Amino acid sequence: MKGFKLSCTASNSNRSTPACSPILRKRSRSPTPQNQDGDTMVEKGSDHSSDKSPSTPEQGVQRSCSSQSGRSGGKNSKKSQSWYNVLSPTYKQRNEDFRKLFKQLPDTERLIVDYSCALQRDILLQGRLYLSENWICFYSNIFRWETLLTVRLKDICSMTKEKTARLIPNAIQVCTDSEKHFFTSFGARDRTYMMMFRLWQNALLEKPLCPKELWHFVHQCYGNELGLTSDDEDYVPPDDDFNTMGYCEEIPVEENEVNDSSSKSSIETKPDASPQLPKKSITNSTLTSTGSSEAPVSFDGLPLEEEALEGDGSLEKELAIDNIMGEKIEMIAPVNSPSLDFNDNEDIPTELSDSSDTHDEGEVQAFYEDLSGRQYVNEVFNFSVDKLYDLLFTNSPFQRDFMEQRRFSDIIFHPWKKEENGNQSRVILYTITLTNPLAPKTATVRETQTMYKASQESECYVIDAEVLTHDVPYHDYFYTINRYTLTRVARNKSRLRVSTELRYRKQPWGLVKTFIEKNFWSGLEDYFRHLESELAKTESTYLAEMHRQSPKEKASKTTTVRRRKRPHAHLRVPHLEEVMSPVTTPTDEDVGHRIKHVAGSTQTRHIPEDTPNGFHLQSVSKLLLVISCVICFSLVLLVILNMMLFYKLWMLEYTTQTLTAWQGLRLQERLPQSQTEWAQLLESQQKYHDTELQKWREIIKSSVMLLDQMKDSLINLQNGIRSRDYTSESEEKRNRYH
């Protein structure tokens, strides 16, 4: 498969034709045929579809050739075609349909992406929008009535986002000097607009897409399975780390052929990388090449001399340039150095040191840039780069303690394995605890870490971690990429940069996307802030242990370092001596007043010391207590207000029922005009009179009853008083007689 890709992508291949060559395609961005205007629109019935003919004989020849070449594998492809290919055609089928529908376009135009949408005319014409590198095309077929529209990107004056019926944001308007085209019913309007705007920008700037960038867009829109065959010779596989934000410069055919041949030969002669990482020290055997005066090239495309002397000033660069031009540099080799190999090619200098511990040429530049998302960590630590790698990417006590603090459980570390492309990867499985009320309490995570083969011990490590979180809402829509870049700054200093990117497998709706990104960025910020603080604590502990060493050990280390550097005194370069001088161990004050470098500038800023962890937790607990009290008080207040509102509504309903009886007495706005209306009014008045009379009768009746009860009570009271008077008189009489 590897050889097949090389044979397909090489521009000097015997099978490539001028019409299909991607280089000639870029250089021959010729104007369209003469019978073609800036934008054309054709409407016709399907019975005239057979009249579509190529505008030029050359196009007809190219199509006939392509059809003949595709016949060889046509039967097999039809037999092996799955049922879902009929419902979801591949990119190859889409591109063939695009060429059949728009025969008036040049054959160099290749479909990049197509979208389902509608064109607004007298009615909405539902169809598909096709985007190529220089054209916007639309095709619709409604009840066998076809509509074709082609607009050249260079002729577009403006491109704006619009709303259907001034309410639904799913439309794009494209304006030329003479016409306006309103496309609506897009499923993902913003993504479509960004693609159209990018192609329009490239067309106006006359900077066409290079083949890798074009096929990168195709893979982004249609996935990895494009349905291509060996007949598609213009296919160029994009790199995994291909950046689509830059423009590709046009390369002459001769230069491209030379580059392709040289790259092919270098791939064929490249030895397989060992499972272990390449060492930092470079022996003389790797630097010398018999029969060639070219300097070997490192992983980032720079000569090894420039890479080794990078950051040491202009004088060292001049030495490396003089070495490349073949001028001899006098160097006195140490007598007891067994690594030097004296041969005919003595112009190439050997390594500056025979020990990997004495390299202080400056900060190493990473061979990959940061991800396009966000950068959370960019810090220099007083560890060697290998020490930092052991802390983060091995089953170290630091890693276990950190995962325990993050409340990770069911942790499974799989060993590092070497892949076919030379990279090394491993898988880590664990369970995390979630605090989001909309998510479950725990979720399983699968983290795949990939260390690129260009990583070197004691120099640079670049590791990508792909994190898949299961059991969370919309977990099948997205995944996370974290890029850890570890570079050497000095002998005992290294820089850690961590950048992250959120990638989508399926495009979510706007509200869902906002929910995902909000929780994603907040969770990662907390995680990496915790990681940085734990690394700072480990750094302070490590420095404290280093300070406990005896003075004899420090003196012996200093003398050994100086002895290793003595063989390089014959270079007589003052700046090199300063760079190669012994590195002193930083003190605690250096850690306390660390200076953080801002990426992309030379400015520095002071990082204040972190507060104690206990005080921080206490302040957080107090804050949570205050928030809970406020929430409880608010709930009680809401309950009281609801009760008051209920009471007022009940009183209002009671008052309304009481006043309904008085509605008949209100003066109407107009007097009755007919006899019927007068009769209805008199009838209502009579009913109201009878009702009121009945109420008064009941009131009088109840009053009479109360008066009778009062009368009876008074009579009983009077009788009681009389009986008492009678008994008292009789007793007095008896007393008198006795």
From Swiss-Prot:
Alphabetical UniProt keywords: Cell membrane, Endoplasmic reticulum, Lipid transport, Lipid-binding, Membrane, Phosphoprotein, Transmembrane, Transmembrane helix, Transport
Ranges for the VASt domain? 372-543
Tell me the membrane topology, using the record's own terms: Single-pass membrane protein
Give every GRAM domain span: 96-163
Residue ranges for the region (Disordered) are: 1-81, 254-301, 544-566
Residue list for modification Phosphothreonine: T584, T585, T587
Tell me which residues bear Phosphoserine. S28, S30, S274, S550, S581
A single GO molecular function term of this UniProt record: phosphatidic acid binding
Return the protein name.
Protein Aster-B
| Organism this protein belongs to | Homo sapiens (Human)
Gene of this entry: GRAMD1B
